Every structure is written in C-alpha cells, then in structure tokens.
Regions:
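N-terminal acidic, glycine/proline-rich low-complexity segments
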Residues: 1-171
Length: 171
C-alpha cells in the first residue's frame, strides 16, 4: 500500500502494520508485499523505490484504525479491505483507549458508513478464496459482527479486471 501511495504521490497516508496473524494458515506463502518490492526492471534495478523506514516503525494497524476513526466525522468513513480480515476483526474486539472511550464495535458503528471487502467466491461456495482461508475465524467475526453495511467484491469479479502492468509503470 505504501509503495502504491508513493508511486501516485500520496506520501502522507499513514500505514498500519499487521501484528495479529496468530490464526493464519498461510504462513508458508511468501508475503505479497515482499514479492512486489523485490520486482526489478529490465536492467535489474528495483522497479519501485524501497520503503524509507521498515515495517517495525509503523504503527499497529488496529491502533491506527482507532486513532483515525476517533478523529473522523460520524458515519463518514468507507473502509476498503483488499486483504485478510485479521485487522478488522481485532478492531471490532478492541477496547476503549486514549483515542476513544468506545470499544471497537461501537467506534465502527459511529464512524463508519460502510465496509467494502475483497473476499470470497459467490459462484462456487467450495472455492477456497485466499483472503478468507488465511484466517477463517477473523473473516467470520467481521461478517457476523460488523455493525454497518458490508459490500463484497468477490474473486470472480476481481479475476475479470485485468490491468496492464505497463500502465502502472507509464501512466
């Protein structure tokens, strides 16, 4: 996300680090972010400028969600999730803190207008979609307990959206 933000000149968008991956069943899969950051051009140079600071310096994703939601107007936030559900599940379970006297579910209900999630496969219920199977309990918690409308962009929609890498590089 940071890489894309910087690519498009949006350098000040804060990035939270995932620290809650206890239920992940996909620890053997290489981190997608690392794969993208290691991409090279035809001359063997990094395709993207590397991060100025390591992930260890990023704020915890749940705390960042709480901080940003607490500052937001009521029902003004659209959250778009294009990955696993563990951060959103942990946000729902979060307790009051210095950012807000509300628990996570209350804070989401007050500040979030909708959640848009890239997950699942509607045409084939037996398909093991990557964003879901990585942490099934977290995904179930989000779909069961999220207090605002959820809009799902399923696998079969995403697989039809082909975007040329050349355009990302040149446009």
């Amino acid at each position: 996300i940071d890489l894309l933000n910087r690519w498009y000149g949006c350098k000040k968008i804060p990035i939270g680090a995932t620290t809650r991956e206890k239920n992940s069943t996909m620890s053997h899969v290489k981190n997608f972010t690392e794969v993208v950051c290691q991409m090279k051009d035809e001359k063997g140079r990094p395709l993207y400028k590397q991060l100025p600071e390591g992930k260890e310096n990023w704020q915890d994703a749940v705390m960042l969600h709480r901080q940003l939601l607490a500052k937001s107007d009521d029902h003004s936030v659209t959250i778009i999730s294009v990955g696993f559900s563990n951060n959103l599940s942990a946000l729902l379970a979060s307790q009051p803190d210095g950012f807000s006297p509300m628990n996570g579910k209350e804070l989401v209900a007050k500040k979030v207008d909708r959640l848009v999630v890239m997950a699942g496969h509607m045409e084939n219920p037996n398909y093991k979609e990557f964003n879901v199977i990585n942490d099934v309990p977290a995904c179930q918690k989000v779909y069961d307990e999220w207090p605002t409308p959820i809009y799902t962009s399923p696998f079969e929609l995403g697989e039809k959206i082909l975007y040329p890498a050349r355009s990302i590089k040149e446009d």
